Amino acid sequence: MTGPVVVVGAGHNGLVAACYLAQAGRDVVVVEQLDRPGGGSRTEETIPGYRFDLHSAAHNIINMTDIPAELDLAGAGLDYIEMDPFSVAVHADGRRVRFFRSIEQTVDSIAESSPAEAQAYRRFMDKSLPIVRTVMPAIRGDTLTRALPRQVANLARALRHDPLATARDAISPYDSLLRRWLPSDLTRGPVAAFAAHAGVGPTVPGGALFAFWQAAYHLFGQWHGRGGAQNLTNALVTRLTALGGQVRCSAPVERIDAPGGTVRAVVLKGGERIGTSSVITAINPQTALLRLLDPPLAGSAGADLAAARRSNVVQALVHVATDRLPAYPHSRPGDWNGLQSYVDRLDDLTTSWTRSEAGLLPDPLPLYAFTPSALDGSLAPPSHHTVYLACPAAPSRVEGGWPARRDELVEAALATMERRAPGFRSTIQGVSPWTPDDMDQAGGWPGGHPMHLDIALDQLGPFRPTRQLGRWRTPIDGLYISGAGTNPSGGIAGTPGRQAARALLADQTK
């Protein structure tokens, strides 16, 4: 092997990959175009005195894996606080549904408004749990030998009642699935809001998986990193440094030299050349293989990657600093611990998604909030709070451009908050929008797409980003891919990073 292994991109997947390589004794250098590591797991003072996550505000998938334990991230400072209830539906008509880690507590909460709906939700979870348990080994990156016995048992449980109906449910859009299983928008709306959080629209075939995924929050919970999502990044950098690895920020890549189909070097903008025979990219795979790779990936592998889909629907954020928590009528202690959903109707979410796909601002604005300062006082001045507002169906490219439309986004978000929490405007100390343009330019995500590519049945698991590239290897000798656009999926998981590192290490020991 020539030179260090170069990891391109210091998001959490790139850092996870680097840690596993360094743990195996490899010399590793991570190069990052931004001035600090973290990617989607960054926390910054976007309003003076108030620290906000720039994208990921709650972590769950990584806590379903062995990655934190295998890298001893707790020993490097990783500290998670559970968010329970993980979600509260704040309906405009005053009804509340609290989704706790405990299914029984959740059923009791739903029963306060509708005993029939509560039992329907229980049946939906009975259906969802074995399906989630079946797909979990792939999400965790378990080996086939370890996973197969559990997968067979869970699949049998999932299919024991009417297997054809289960197959139909699995390939359905979650709009259809939720209408079959849940009787009203009391629970359909908030469950759909969580499914939309994955970046999947209500009418996308196969999107049902992300409504079934509601069961995963009951199984594993939802977690806030103390001090924000940056806590995970800091722990990974600490562990990597302790293992002898190196992170270089403000080091954008000009190209990856691979003459004759073999990696030779990573060349930084400015001309510095890092000689290497091994590279893992942890950025958008289309950027890595079609723009940075020199020569670009060709043949059917390149054509398939170029055809991978990226829709016009992404996420937009509004950070709001306040001097108190949102004053929801009929609130109870704990209502600010997790996600607070303002999606009242499944139809509204579908309408908003359609408008955003067409480049229009969504109307009505689908919105949810996190108030992490309710759990973590380090994020705001004493007695003050951080309110993180997220629209899961914002247009990447909007009619008129985001510079001209950002104020409309802010006004729509604040108006929604005022309706749900009367008097909210009077508590505001500062506002900072974070549009798809900002995520593109300051976050390094083309089009503001944190998942890099759409989440869809044909772009998930071993088909992500494409079938030919779904095992983290490329046709270029020494070049591997990782990140949200690779197998198995996006989100704060770390699995793509670990699996890419394992692929490289396995190939080098052959």
Model-derived features with residue positions:
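Helical element adjacent to the flavin cofactor pocket in flavoenzyme catalytic cores
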Residues: 213-263
